[in-house]
Amino acid sequence: MATQWEVVIGLETHAQLSTVSKIFSGASTQFGAEPNTQACPVDLALPGVLPVLNRGAVERAIRFGLAIGSTIAPRSIFARKNYFYPDLPKGYQISQYEIPVVQGGQITIQVPANEKAGKPAYEKTVNLTRAHLEEDAGKSLHEDFAGMTGIDLNRAGTPLLEIVTEPEMRSAAEAVAYAKALHALVVWLGICDGNMQEGSFRCDANVSVRPVGQEKFGTRAEIKNLNSFRFLEEAINYEVRRQIELIEDGGEVVQETRLYDPDKRETRSMRSKEDAHDYRYFPDPDLMPLVIGRDWVERVQSGMPELPAAMQQRFVDEYGVSAYDAGVLTSSKAMAAYFESVVAKAGAANAKIVANWLMGDVSSQLNRDGIEIDAIPVSAAQLALLLQRIADGTISNKIAKEIFATIWDEKATDEGAADRIIDAKGLKQISDTGALEAIIDEVLAANAKSVEEFRAGKEKAFNALIGQAMKATKGKANPQQVNELLKKKLG
C-alpha cells in the first residue's frame, strides 16, 4: 500500500441489548422465531399505538457508559430519524441525535504485531464520540419468494446501542483490534450476547484516505453491516486500495454507502451516503425526555462486575501470573471465573501451573471440540485435584496430560476422578530413591556409548540417558530425581 497515504477509519457499532422485550414494546426479542410472530401493534406501527421505553435498555446503556469512563447524560431525548425502507413500518426510526445518553469515553486496544510489515505490537487508546439508544429495523428476506422480497418484522424494535468512535484508527488492524475489544467488553458486561452470526454485534466502517501530513479528511465511504472480524478487515483493506487507486488515476472518491461482498472480497456501491439533515431529525413527541438521576447511576454502578483491566492487574498482583497470561485469562468472564475456581481449590501457590494449563492443554482441547470454556466437561474441582497431584509429586506432567484427556473424554462426574484413574491404571510416579538408582544403574550399563559421549562433552547424550530412564519406567519416574541422580552418578 502506498506510504504517502494515511488511512482514516471510524467505526459505528450496533450492539443488540440483551433485554427480554423490545425497546418500546413488550414483544419478545428472542432470535429464530417464525417470521412476524414477535411483532406487536407498536412494532407494526398500527394507528394509535404509543411507545413505552424499556428501563432495562437504559440501564444497559448506563452500564456501558460507566465501563468506558463516559459522561451519562442527566437528560437526553429521543428523535425520529426519517427515511423510507420496506422493513421500517413507521417511516422513521426512533433514535437519539442531539443529546445521546452516553457521551465520550475511551477503549484501550492491543494491536498485534505485523511481522510481514515489520511492525511490533502496540497499545492505543480509541476515543468514543457517543453511544446512543435506538430501535432496530426489520429484515428483508430475498429467498424463497419467487423473485419478490418478504419482510420479517420480528427484529423491528429490538433495542440497539450504537457506539460511535472518533475517526482515530489508521489501519484495518487497529479497527479489528478495537472491534474485538468492544465485543469482549459488551459480552463481559452482560449487555449483549455478541453473537455476530445472528446480527447481535455488527459494524459500519467509515473509511477515507488523505495524503500524509494533510489535516483535512478525505471523502469517506461507509461500509455497512460487517458481521465478522475477518469481513471487517478485508472490507477496509479493499476499500483503502480502491480509494487510493481511484485518486491516483485522477478520479474522485464520492460519499456513498457500500456493501461488502465476501465471495468476491470487494465492496460495491449501495447508495449515496446521506448526511444528518437528509434524515430530518426532530424530537419524538410520543416520548418524554429521558431523565437519569444520580441515584439511578449509582444503583447501576453498584451492580457492575469487576472490569477486565482491573481483574488483569489483580491476577498479576494476587496470583503472580504475567501480564500477558492475565490478559489471556481475562479474555472472557467465563475463562476468568474458571481460573479462579480452580485456584480456589488447588491453592494460590499453584496459580501459575493453573494458568499454564488453561492456556495450554485446556485451550487446545476446547479448540479441538469447538466449545467454549463454560461448556468444559472437566470441572474446576477435577482439574484442581489433577494439578495438585503434579505439585505433590504423585504424577508427572506427562502422565497428568493423559489423565486429563481421559477425564475429558469419559465426561467423568466424580471430583476424585484423577485419583481414581491414577489408582486404576497404576500411574503413580516413582519417587523412591533406591528404586530409581537401581533403574539408572541398569540404564548406564546398557548405554555405555552414551556415557562415553557425555563424558566427552556431548550434552545431547545426557538427554538420551534421561529418555532411556523414563522409557524404562514407562514415564512414571520423577523427572527431576532422574536428572539429579544421573548427574550424581556421571560425576
From Swiss-Prot:
Pfam families: GatB_N (PF02934), GatB_Yqey (PF02637)
Keywords: ATP-binding, Ligase, Nucleotide-binding, Protein biosynthesis
Catalytic activity: L-glutamyl-tRNA(Gln) + L-glutamine + ATP + H2O = L-glutaminyl-tRNA(Gln) + L-glutamate + ADP + phosphate + H(+); L-aspartyl-tRNA(Asn) + L-glutamine + ATP + H2O = L-asparaginyl-tRNA(Asn) + L-glutamate + ADP + phosphate + 2 H(+)
Alphabetical GO biological process terms: glutaminyl-tRNAGln biosynthesis via transamidation; translation
Gene Ontology molecular function: any one: ATP binding
InterPro entries to which the protein is assigned, alphabetical: Asn/Gln-tRNA_amidoTrfase_suB/E, Asn/Gln-tRNA_Trfase_suB/E_cat, Asn/Gln_amidotransferase, Asn/Gln_tRNA_amidoTrase-B-like, GatB, GatB_C_1, GatB_Yqey_C_2, Gln-tRNA_amidoTrfase_suB_CS
Enzyme Commission number, as recorded: 6.3.5.-
Top EC class for this record: ligase
SUPFAM superfamilies registered for this protein in UniProt: GatB/YqeY motif (SSF89095), Glutamine synthetase/guanido kinase (SSF55931)
Entry similarity comment: Belongs to the GatB/GatE family. GatB subfamily.
PANTHER family listed in its UniProt record: GLUTAMYL-TRNA GLN AMIDOTRANSFERASE SUBUNIT B MITOCHONDRIAL AND PROKARYOTIC PET112-RELATED, GLUTAMYL-TRNA(GLN) AMIDOTRANSFERASE SUBUNIT B, MITOCHONDRIAL
Subunit structure comment from the entry: Heterotrimer of A, B and C subunits.
Function text: Allows the formation of correctly charged Asn-tRNA(Asn) or Gln-tRNA(Gln) through the transamidation of misacylated Asp-tRNA(Asn) or Glu-tRNA(Gln) in organisms which lack either or both of asparaginyl-tRNA or glutaminyl-tRNA synthetases. The reaction takes place in the presence of glutamine and ATP through an activated phospho-Asp-tRNA(Asn) or phospho-Glu-tRNA(Gln).
Protein name in the entry: Aspartyl/glutamyl-tRNA(Asn/Gln) amidotransferase subunit B
Organism: Burkholderia cenocepacia (strain HI2424)
Taxonomic lineage: Bacteria, Pseudomonadati, Pseudomonadota, Betaproteobacteria, Burkholderiales
